[in-house]
Each structure stands twice: as structure tokens, then as C-alpha cells.
């Protein structure tokens, strides 16, 4: 019964959500696009000619926005464990980023030290228990960070979803040791009750 009430409440919030309505009106696949757009408007992360990887891409809001900003030049690779409808000038990998063969498929597409920007909106399936969800989420951040350290070119940038909890401070410290600028962003489109924030790391140092 509680789950039914919770589901109804979530659906009501979803359909009343200004960002959901905005995404529908502007032809975007998800409200999440406005999280990336707000940060990109301030930081100018995405430009034509770049090589960009988008992890946790489905249904494709971030990828769609990046594709528009890149204007058909450069290379944009999206990856997700869930299917995603095709987008112009986007290469899509269907698979679990945690699996070695999927990671290798991605590495094969992007020559080492040529990546300009890593985007990651990856999140685990949430159980509702912070003791379970936060470590799972942090593991995904760690995997994304490891990939960035192997693939980013000098001066490259990274934007990853990160949840407040155990391991948060350590990951921020690690990022500050490898990048010139590290900040935490909470975009307006992130729901206030959510523990999600975004770690922006700019200027990768080899």
C-alpha cells in the first residue's frame, strides 16, 4: 500500500515538474538535459570538434544536448546498459560499463589520450537503502574516474554524478590531485530531496 502511494506521489510530481514540461515542449528526451545545460552554460564544456564520451546515457537527454552543441563535428560516443534510440552523429554502445568486454569496446573506439570530455550520469538501481545505494553509486564514480585518468587528453574535463555519503570526500580529494579545478554543482533541475550532485573536474594533469 505504501509503495502504491509513493508511486502515485512520484507520478504526480513527475507530471507537475516544470523541467518535464520544458523537456517535452523543447523536444528533449528527459528533464536531465537541463542539469547538463545549466552547468555547460556556465563552464562552456561542450564545443564542436571535441571527442566526448557519455556514460549512463539512456534515454539520451545529455547525448542529445551534446550532439546539438557539437554541430556534427568531432566524435560522440554514448554508452548505457539500457537501449537508446539513435541520435545523429552518435555512436552507441549497449552494455554494462562494469564489464571488462564492454569497457574494452569503448576503449577501442577512443584512442588513448584523445578524450576531451567525459560525461557520466550513471546511477545504480536504487534500493531505497543508503547503506546499499551509496557504495554502489560511488563504485560507478570510481570506474568513471579511472576511465578518465586513462583516456583524457592533457587539459581534458570530466563531469560525473556523485552522491553525498561515504567515500565522497575521498573522491573529491582524488580529483583535486589530478585536475586544476574541481567544483561540486547542484543544478536547479536536480530534485532538492535527492543526494545527487555533480563533480566537475577541469584541466586534467597527466
From Swiss-Prot:
InterPro entries cross-referenced by the UniProt entry: RNA_methyltr_RlmE, RNA_MeTrfase_FtsJ_dom, rRNA-MeTfrase_E, SAM-dependent_MTases_sf
EC number, as in UniProt: 2.1.1.166
Similarity section: Belongs to the class I-like SAM-binding methyltransferase superfamily. RNA methyltransferase RlmE family.
Residues annotated as the enzyme's active site: 161
Stretches assigned to coiled coil: none
Catalytic activity as recorded in UniProt: uridine(2552) in 23S rRNA + S-adenosyl-L-methionine = 2'-O-methyluridine(2552) in 23S rRNA + S-adenosyl-L-homocysteine + H(+)
A GO-annotated cellular component: cytoplasm
Protein name from the UniProt record: Ribosomal RNA large subunit methyltransferase E
Task performed by this protein: Specifically methylates the uridine in position 2552 of 23S rRNA at the 2'-O position of the ribose in the fully assembled 50S ribosomal subunit.
Originating gene: rlmE
Entry's Gene Ontology molecular function annotations: rRNA (uridine-2'-O-)-methyltransferase activity
Annotated S-adenosyl-L-methionine binding sites: 60, 62, 80, 96, 121
Domain of life: Bacteria
KW Transferase (keyword) present: yes
Subcellular location: Cytoplasm
Enzyme kind, highest EC tier: transferase
Keywords associated with the record: Cytoplasm, Methyltransferase, rRNA processing, S-adenosyl-L-methionine, Transferase
